[in-house]
A protein has these predicted regions:
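N-terminal beta1-alpha1 cap of cysteine-dependent amidohydrolase-like domains
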Residues: 1-120
Length: 120
């Protein structure tokens, strides 16, 4: 998994060097978050990054990680689809729109919070 996110990995290490801070990255398969408690996998993390991606694989696991970050005041950084998922998590769990969804997902919903631009 590390090689798939090499550019993010390097960017975080460069930032930590500039901030004179130690960095330890823990890679977590989002599908594991669908099968296990987010607390079990994320406890002890000082920040959570959900990168971009495609498809529905691990989708709800990523939402669980984002919810865990919000509820436990852990800094969160969502990139592309990761940011869209943060919007969905907030819509579902704070605004009570339980079926909030993005059109990028194959799941049907009456409440698409994020749509696809016509030019895409």
């Amino acid at each position: 998994m590390k090689d798939a996110y090499k550019s993010l990995h390097e960017a975080l290490y460069h930032a930590s060097y500039e901030a004179n801070s130690n960095l330890s990255i823990k890679y977590i398969d989002s599908e594991e978050l669908e099968q296990s408690s987010p607390k079990k996998l994320l406890e002890g993390c000082d920040g959570i990054l959900v990168p971009g991606g495609f498809g529905d694989r691990g989708f709800e696991g990523k939402i669980s990680a984002i919810q865990y970050a919000r509820e436990n005041n852990i800094p969160f950084f969502g990139i592309c689809l990761g940011l869209q998922m943060a919007v969905l998590e907030f819509a579902r769990n704070v605004c009570s729109i339980k079926d909030a969804q993005t059109r990028e997902s194959k799941k049907r919903s009456k409440n698409y919070i994020i749509d696809i631009m016509e030019s895409q």
